[in-house]
Design a protein with these regions (language model features):
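Adenosine-cofactor binding site in Rossmann-like domains, unifying the SAM/SAH pocket
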Residues: 36, 42-58
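Conserved beta-loop-beta element that borders a ligand/cofactor-binding pocket
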Residues: 115-116, 153-178, 191-194, 202-209
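NAD(P)H cofactor-binding loop motif with strongest signal on the N-terminal glycine-rich segment
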Residues: 23
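NAD(P)H-binding glycine-rich loop region in Rossmannoid oxidoreductase-like domains
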Residues: 52-93, 102-105
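Conserved Rossmann-fold NAD(P)-dependent oxidoreductase catalytic core, especially the SDR/UDP-sugar
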Residues: 97-142
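C-terminal substrate-binding subdomain of Rossmann-fold SDR/epimerase-dehydratase oxidoreductases
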Residues: 11, 26, 32-40, 199-321
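Flexible, glycine-rich beta-alpha linker
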Residues: 51, 119-121, 168-190, 216-217
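Active-site helix of classical SDR
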Residues: 144, 148-151
Length: 321
């Protein structure tokens, strides 16, 4: 059982004007829900209304905010990353740069920009420690996205030194949870597996085909824990240094598949398609710094998080053929 650690401070958030870019997305929805429960005045920035690649749109988005939480991003799984490297690099880099500059010009008091574990070098020793972040190039399929997100740390440090602008860019582990993207074209591993296993169980399919060998390892952070970490970062993180946010627990992809199979109740065969890429060989985080600087520790076990996610996704299929 994971320990219960720090919770966001309602007195900090009460009536505070907070802008959340990507606030209608997967992680943003959880962040906005927590902020509203804490009494913040929340402005949700949607891509349909604000193209943050445009400096003018970014300026309008952050105007009047005391705190900005930047979550808007172009994201996808391994297949999407391999097909669309250019927009993953360009869109994420330009959106982040515009949000930093326009937040500074608008007099925002604190900017929290989500960074990603994909920023780490391909062959970083596990667990990933923040001091190893700059010791190599990311895994190739992740590099355009990972390096664009890594620039959030560069911008945070540069703006702090040049303008004394208070910002941080916590490095988030792989996220999962209800309301994730379950589209097989661009979903991440847990959402893709859940969709495949639930569909196979529902339709009586004898096997589920999964990408790769199943041998790589990953770390998975439940979305509600990630949302809490970002609010704690806004309150407590007074540095532009990288800070890992995760569970600090490693899970083999093959074991993840077995867990999801069991929870779904699928009794067929799992087939591993080794002609498909595995991605990075191993990935999980040393989370000591987050515990020390933010008082953060994840509280949702992988089994419980998977159960909630599966139940949520399955409920969307009720009545469908």
């Amino acid at each position: 059982m994971l320990l219960v650690m720090a919770r966001p401070d309602a007195t900090y958030w009460q009536d505070r004007r907070v802008t959340v870019t990507g606030g209608a997305g997967f992680l943003g929805t959880a962040v906005v829900r927590d902020l509203e429960q804490l009494g913040a005045q929340v402005s949700v920035i949607r891509s349909s209304q604000y193209d943050l690649r445009d400096p003018g749109a970014a300026r309008a988005a952050v105007s009047g905010a005391e705190v900005v939480i930047h979550l808007a991003a172009r994201v996808g799984g391994i297949g999407f990353n391999r097909r669309h490297p250019a927009p993953l690099a360009y869109d994420n880099l330009v959106m982040g740069s515009n949000v930093f500059e326009q937040s500074r010009l608008a007099g925002v008091g604190k900017l929290v920009a989500a960074c990603s574990v994909c920023a780490y070098p391909k062959f970083t020793p596990v667990p990933f420690a923040e001091d190893d972040l700059w010791n190599g190039y990311p895994e190739e399929s992740n590099a355009p996205y990972g390096l664009a997100k890594k620039m959030m740390l560069v911008l945070s440090d540069a703006y702090r030194r040049e303008y004394d602008f208070d910002s941080c860019a916590p490095i988030l582990a792989n996220l999962y949870g209800p309301d994730d993207n379950f589209d097989l074209e661009d979903s991440h591993v847990i959402a893709a597996m859940i969709r495949k296993f639930v569909g196979a169980e529902k339709h009586g399919t004898p096997e589920v085909v999964l990408w790769g060998t199943g041998e790589p390892t990953r770390e998975f952070l439940y979305v509600d824990d990630a949302a809490r970490a970002l609010l704690l970062a806004a309150e407590r993180l007074q540095t532009s240094e990288p800070v890992n946010v995760g569970t600090g627990r490693e899970t083999k992809i093959r074991d993840l598949a077995e867990s999801i199979r069991t929870l779904v109740g699928f009794e067929g065969e799992i087939v591993w398609d080794s002609t498909r890429p595995d991605g990075q060989p191993a990935r999980y985080l040393d989370v000591t710094r987050a515990r020390e600087l933010m008082g953060f520790e994840a509280t949702t076990s992988l089994e419980e998080g998977l159960r909630r996610t599966i139940d949520s996704f399955a409920s969307t299929l009720v009545g469908t053929s």
